[in-house]
Amino acid sequence: MNIKIIGSGSYIPEIKVTNQDFHKHMFLNEDGTPLTHSTEVIIGKFKSITGIEERRYADENLLTSDIAAIAAENAIIDAKIDRESIDYIILAHNFGDVKHGKIQADTVPSLATRVKNKLRIKNPKCVAY
């Protein structure tokens, strides 16, 4: 069996939250008391330790399977292939879809199976793991 990756895709959420957005936040110790350093100092230390200046958040209406399907669609376009020629969909994840505001995961069917459906792949030989 020959295996090769011929395309890749990704999804980068549009909602940006920069370190500056945290200036309005109060940072607390484990016991709930405020940290003694200023917010500016805390944010500066966080950046110097992690290198993170901004993070991205997905829209609250998007599920994990939606995000994965967008990335998969981009990979199909990048590879210039017919989606029906895909042999396997492998989605490495240990949790299912979780709707915004909920704590219960929806794990069945698997995320890979949901992605196959969202990609409208009809080929029964395309196995979703």
Give the residues covered by each predicted segment:
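Surface-exposed, flexible loop/turn segments at secondary-structure boundaries
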Residues: 13, 94-97
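Conserved catalytic cysteine-centered active-site region
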Residues: 39-65, 96-129
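Short glycine-rich, polar/acidic loop-and-turn segments at beta strand-coil junctions
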Residues: 61, 72, 90-95
